[in-house]
Each structure stands twice: as C-alpha cells, then as structure tokens.
C-alpha cells in the first residue's frame, strides 16, 4: 500500500490510478479503507478512486506523539492528502465520519468539486449515538480503550447495541472487522491516537457553526442516508440536504449507518447516477 508523509505522520492509502475524475472515499472511527471494498470496483473503471486510511483507530502506523488528531486536526490531514497528491475538483465521499463540515468551516474545501455525505456525523452528533458515547466514555478511563477493544475479540460482543450492533443491519464480515479492530487491540500507540481524536471534539456551539459552513459549498452534493439508521438520525440527512445549495437527497432502505456494508449495490447505483449527471 502506498504511503504519504503528512504533518502528523505517515498514512497509508489506496489509489486505483487512471485519468478519470477523482473520487476520494473516507471511513469512520475504528475502520479503514476496506469499508469501501464492495463499492470501489464499480467505480474504478471510469473514476480514479483514492482511499486514505485516516488515524481514527483502524490505522496501522501510529502518528507522531503530540500530533493534532482532534476533529479539525484530522480534517486538516484530509486536506493535506489532497494537496500532496495534487488532487483537484475531487468528489469527496464520507460515511460515518463527519469531517466535511470541519473542512469547510476551516476553509479547506477548495479542492472539493462535489460532495457525497452518506449517514455520517453532523451538526452536534459527536460522539454519535450509543456506540460513540460508549467509546468516548472508555477513552476517558485509564485502560478503557484497551478493555473496550479487548472485549471485541469476542465476535458476539460486536453485535451489542453499545458496540457495532446499531451500525449495520447485517454483521460486518469478520474478515473486515478483524482488520479494523486489530490495530487498537494490539498497539498502545494506536489507542493513544484514537484517544486524542475521541477527546478532541469541540463544544456543541462550535460544531453547529461548522455545519452552517456547508451553506457556502457551491458544488453539486448528494446526501444518501440510511432509512433505518439508529446512530445518525435520518432528520440530520434531510437537514444537511437543506443546508447544501445544490444537494439531492435519497434514503436507502434496508440499511443502517454502514451503507457500504449493508447496501453497497444501491449506494453504488446512487453514486454512479450522481457522478454521471453532475460536473465537479
């Protein structure tokens, strides 16, 4: 997997290459780029798909001690990825992680031509739902993250409401989830990075100001929300679509937050339609 040296450390990324329009796909906490494994093959023939592994707990290379891994800090790293790879007019696709509103609030959206938000953190929904609150509570306790991720070695524990049970209707394949969880289960430095992110969420008032910054994005946008989401409220998807001046809104039935896991074919169809009928 290729690597990029960023201000916070070295990040891995996947890149299908090619001369087509660029689609950058981002994942959430305690995941990695493989979240999109069932979606990218349907795009890569026409689009260059870039998938960075963000330092959100599923990454395999610890960041530098003391690096800014707060929500705005990780948003700045996304902007660095786009700059280092000289990517312009990209279509930025997010699932679970809500960093888009931070990117625009920080004035870092100049390389983004189109935006796709799929069941992600928004407004003041940080940490999101019961799983998010449970993870932040663990991060505040000495040894809490080690215990929380140790519990997830037991596969039945992964379907509990306070862990991953509310994130998808069907279980995340064990191969994927084993890979997502292993870094935080085995590396104190990865847990340190994750703790920095989880405890680096700004106050509610600032989060709401960030969301308002999305009004300034003038490019085409698609908001695709899971109709049965238990973590990212469906109403948030509708509100995001109302904020974005050129947004289309769709709800995807039979899915919770992790639409790329629950309904990859339906999500791919919506993505391809959006990409075909809009220009960055």
Where are these regions (language model features)?
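Short, hydrophobic alpha-helix immediately C-terminal to the catalytic nucleophile
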Residues: 37, 103-104, 268
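A short loop-to-beta-strand scaffold at the N-terminal edge of the catalytic core in hydrolase folds
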Residues: 7-15
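Conserved HGGG/HGGXW glycine-rich cap/lid loop of the alpha/beta-hydrolase fold
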Residues: 15-61
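Gly/Ala-rich beta-loop-alpha elbow adjacent to hydrolase catalytic centers
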Residues: 94, 98
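Flexible "cap/lid" subdomain of the alpha/beta-hydrolase fold that forms the substrate-access gate
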Residues: 9, 29-30, 50, 55-88, ...
